[in-house]
From Swiss-Prot:
The cysteine framework is XXI (CC-C-C-C-CC-C-C-C). Its main location: secreted. May form a non-covalent dimer. One of its GO terms (cellular component) is extracellular region. Expressed by the venom duct. This is Conotoxin p21a. It comes from Conus purpurascens (Purple cone).
Amino acid sequence: FELLPSQDRSCCIQKTLECLENYPGQASQRAHYCQQDATTNCPDTYYFGCCPGYATCMSINAGNNVRSAFDKCINRLCFDPGH
């Protein structure tokens, strides 16, 4: 079992954030869509997609302010073995 698949975390987070910024006020609803979108745009994003832990954090915290949620979520584990 590979606990933390190797992938380009910075690509996943950047692409997810860029996508979310296209949906002002809808970030919470769009986080998982944007995570899937990032998966198609980042190489080697593994079987589970592009940093799902970050996308989940953004969906919970984003509300109307993507940037403040970004600050909370930037260090979130991509793959949490507890879930």
